[in-house]
Each structure stands twice: as structure tokens, then as C-alpha cells.
């Protein structure tokens, strides 16, 4: 499996839309602490599996972020803070991650996961009551014998599981190994 590129929009530390192109062969992500390497890893994992890694908690789905006496994460917190701060009442902020991959047969796939948050009236921007956050939307597009095929939600998850079966998912917080 070859990852051709990733486009990240308003996801965690990534503000607005940013695209990274990857070349064939080995690609290294190197940088100082706090510069977005772990958030990039989260973007890959979120687009494929709908989860992000939270230190001290582990893998969590963004549709159900953890709430406990020791830790509370608001439903909107994986969306970029600058985008949320700049939003006006009734603005919709979209967070998304899209990857383009090529399988071993040369077939291209575009996988995209997105979520939208609507800015509500009457609360400070960083209040949980200030946002109405929708569920994750998942889409997989690829060419088929009948033209471009687009799969959504459960069918898209099935296609991702076909492309990345459990037996080849070697994932830890510090590295991502794809076939």
C-alpha cells in the first residue's frame, strides 16, 4: 500500500487545509516536540478508524470522547481551536482528513472522514454548549468497472477493513506500519 498524500483540514493542530505529498519509498516525519508529528499520526488513524490517541487514556472514538472525574474532553476538542475561536454564531466548522492511497494492483482509493460543528448562540466559544457537533462522515472513492464508485459510512468501513485487515494493522502511538 502506498500513501500518496494526506490533506488535513481544521483537525487538532492543523488549521485550515494542509496537504502533504509523499514520494514512493521511505518517508520520514522529523521535527521538534510540539510541531504536529503525533497529530499527523492521529490524522492517519482517525481517517482510517475514527479514533484518536489521548495520552493517559488510549484510543478513543471522536463520536464518544471520554468523560470522567479525572478527565473530561469536550465533544468539539479534536477540531482546531483557532477555527473554533474565529467562528461566528451559526458558522459551521468542518474538520476533515483525506488520504489518497494506491494498492498493490495500482488501484487508487480516496478515503475521507469529516465532522462538522455548528456554532450556537449565547455561550463562550470554548463552552461545550456553544457547539452542536455532528457524527463522523466516512467516504471511500475508487474507480470500478462501472466508473467511480463512492461508498459511505458502513460500506466505506467494510472497504477500509478489506484494504487494511486486522492481521496487518501494526499500530502503536509512535509508529504506523502499513503493508
Residue ranges: model-predicted function:
Residues 17, 94-96, 110:
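Intrinsic-disorder/low-complexity, polar/charged segments enriched in Ser/Thr/Lys/Arg/Asp/Glu/Gln
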Residues 7, 98-102, 112-114:
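Residue-level recognition of well-ordered beta-strand positions that form the cores
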Residues 13, 104-106:
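Glycine-centered tight beta-turn/hairpin loop motif at sheet-sheet or coil-to-beta transitions
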Residues 4-6, 91-98:
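Short, hydrophobic/aromatic-rich segments at coil-to-beta transitions
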Residues 60, 69-77, 81-84, 108-173:
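Glycine-rich phosphate-binding loops of NTPases
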Residues 1-54, 59-67:
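Pre-Walker A-like glycine/lysine-rich segment at the N-terminus of P-loop NTPase domains
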Residues 174-179:
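Conserved small/polar residues in nucleotide/adenosyl-binding loops
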Residues 87-94, 104:
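A short catalytic or substrate-binding loop motif that flags glycine-/basic-rich loops and adjacent residues
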